């Protein structure tokens, strides 16, 4: 099923000089299907479920520091998702169970920080390497998320708080 995530503003990258006002991102499964204005996407995808968010929608972030403290690895990973991140740096995911918890919900474990962005259908695709550990994907280089790239999105309100996080196409955090 397709989901059309609509926000006051869509940014392909957080430093995007030309955001799409009243824009949206279509998500099909775990992939991005299209990026554009609400009107054009609604016309192209009339059967898509629409989720409307107050704030700015853009690429999910990479959590670049120590993971928040919590009683369990699962809760530590969930705390990262609540911040709008769908990837963590490997150097901070060394505690027992953290990588398994990340893999279960689709959070990427990266060897280094990368710049994330949502590109148009003609953008550069992601390059990933699957490690020998089942279920863990280590992204060695991400130069953009294309129209067929993984759907990792975050929505932030005017105060900079994360309103929603989409990880590999799944809504994994929504602030009440």
Predicted feature residues:
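N-terminal metal-binding scaffold of metallo-dependent hydrolase/deaminase domains
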Residues: 1-43, 119-162, 166-176
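Short, acidic/turn-prone active-site loops that include or flank metal/cofactor-
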Residues: 55, 67-70, 93, 112-116, ...
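Non-catalytic positions within long, well-ordered alpha-helices that form the structural scaffold/packing
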Residues: 73, 81-84
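Residue-level marker for well-ordered alpha-helical positions
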Residues: 74-75, 96, 142
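Alpha-helical segments flanking ligand/cofactor-binding loops in enzyme cores
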Residues: 78-81, 100, 146
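Residues at the N-termini of beta-strands
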Residues: 87-88, 153
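Active-site loop-helix segments enriched in His/Asp/Glu that coordinate
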Residues: 88-122
């Amino acid at each position: 099923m397709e989901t059309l995530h609509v926000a006051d503003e869509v940014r392909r990258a957080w430093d995007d000089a030309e955001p799409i006002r009243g824009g949206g991102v279509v998500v099909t499964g775990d992939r991005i299907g299209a990026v554009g204005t609400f009107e054009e996407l609604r016309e192209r995808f009339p059967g898509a479920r629409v989720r409307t968010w107050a704030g700015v929608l853009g690429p999910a972030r990479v959590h670049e520091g120590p993971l928040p403290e919590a009683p369990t690895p699962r809760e530590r990973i969930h705390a990262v998702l609540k911040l709008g991140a769908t990837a963590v740096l490997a150097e901070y995911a060394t505690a027992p169970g953290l990588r398994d918890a990340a893999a279960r919900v689709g959070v990427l474990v990266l060897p280094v920080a990368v710049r994330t962005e949502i590109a148009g259908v003609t953008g550069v695709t992601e390059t990933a390497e699957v490690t020998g550990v089942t279920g863990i994907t280590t992204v060695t280089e991400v130069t953009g998320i294309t129209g067929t790239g993984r759907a990792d999105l975050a929505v932030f309100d005017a105060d900079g708080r994360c309103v929603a996080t989409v990880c590999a196409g799944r809504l994994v955090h929504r602030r009440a």
